[in-house]
Amino acid sequence: LDPKASALPEWTDLESSLSSDASVVIIDTETGERIPLWAELDAEIGDEQPLLIVQPAVALLDGHSYAVAMRNLKTTSGADVVPSPIFEFYRDGYTSDNERLNRRTTEMEAMFTALTSAGIERSTLQLAWDFTVASTQNLTGRILEVRDNTLDWLDTHTPEYAITSIVPASKEDVAVQVAGTFKLPTHLTGNGSAGQKFAYDSTTPGPNDLPILGEVVDVPFICQVPKVAVEDPSTVLHPGLYGHGLLGSEYEIDYGGDVRALAQEADVLFCATKWAGMSEDDVGNAVVSLQDLSNFPTVADRLQQGIVNMIALGRLMNTDDGILSDPAFGDIKVAGDLVYYGNSQGGIMGSALTAVSPDISRAVLGVPATNYGLLLLRSIDFDQYESIMEPAYPSRRDRTIAISLLQMLWDRGEGGGYINHITRDPLPGTQLDKAVLMHVAWGDHQVSELAAFNEARSLGAKIYRPVVADGRSRETTPGWGLDSVTDGDTGSVIVIWDSGADMIPLGVTPPGGEHDPHEDPRDDKMARSQMAEFLFDGVFTDVCGGKPCTAQRSG
């Protein structure tokens, strides 16, 4: 396939994917709505024939059916791509004595009718297919059951926790660091440790079965009281949850200087726990799952448990006899709505947490995105893990397809499956006015800005403009599909922070360049000031003076 001769829509010009003659099209088969997209060949395929990857530029709606159509595609020799005989059979309306072929005719005709109604001429099609997105129940039913069971359990049990460590002045901006564990029922098998799946009543659960309560286990936590609370004992601290990065730990709250700085600058008491499923405890199971993809349900299930663990920690922070009532915290004052702040994986998982939590309505997502299936092939973090995967799956084509298929499970355990339920269509038991502030590092080597833009469009977020300085974007319209935010606006917002890193490559490959800006936005004091205004006043503040937002390079 020749991508240029085929005029494949590129992420640099998403508007072109909506043109009447676009070579690759996605439509909602019920409404006829065109979906913005880009299409590209896998850039690191080696000697194998490259895959054509079609990437919607906005989240598809739960339970909706869509059709993908391709036309005017050219080979590298300049010839038209020849449709398969099977596709021609249906497109051209043939019949057969083979009932296996005729069995699909009704469904194919419905798809062709939908495409024709959307202005896609049937005779021009080289390939088309339709599919239905997983339902909201399929994506969220399990975690909502786990959440509700867990909160019911907390409501009927006196909080049980153990303080295992008290470190006064652990850092110069920390008054006291308190670590420990709290009791919580798991919905996983056994003791809920890495590698466990959801527990069900049946040993052979059906698609509609829901997880059940299992053992009561110890969940780790750490909290840090900022120094401002002892410098001025009248200070009332805001309660906040923090979410750590890739395969990390709750102790990022301590070694992450940005978290301590935000706590000190904005009067926040942050607590954290592990993202069970993708924490330091899960590295071994992640390796096993990459070597044997049939093990991946253990990752997706435990991620959902990890989200609920975070919800439970937040509830125990705001309970009169909960964790913060312990003498280890001294005579501090904590009040206000629970907020969330997380970076990298914490930004990705934070989208899911925000959607599912009954207590969080404001979240700051640092270097965030959704959809690991899109992220991994564009992340330097995946280089090492792909090398682990390669012996079992030596074909890059197979690995790329497998990652895309895994996303159907991953959607239940990361932001991708919940993105349609943060700013609209709220999930049962959650608040109605949720909003997030997304801080994106321009040219990020680890979390692609392309996936962040997809998330922002899906949220209906506004974007700060100018997005970047002239000449610093490959897009025809930087921030395409997003309305501009103005100072004082409420609602969800995405802000690009540019520290001068190289722009991301056009193809499906990780960025290069000497500097990875991944940590730059969070280390910028003005960026943190914007975070605080959003979290605690509910408004967007222009801290960049109407100019592109720039950050100093970390380190």
Residue ranges and their predicted role:
Residues R302-Q305, S361-G555:
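C-terminal subdomain of alpha/beta-hydrolase-fold enzymes, centered on the catalytic histidine
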Residues E44-R71, T75-T76, G214-V259:
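A conserved hydrophobic secondary-structure block that centers on an alpha-helix together
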Residues T235-P239, A266-L269, A335-D337, P358-R362, ...:
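Loop/turn elements at helix/coil->beta-strand transitions in domains of secreted/extracellular proteins
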Residues A7-D13, P36-A39, S65-A69, T76-F87, ...:
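Short, solvent-exposed loop/turn and secondary-structure capping segments
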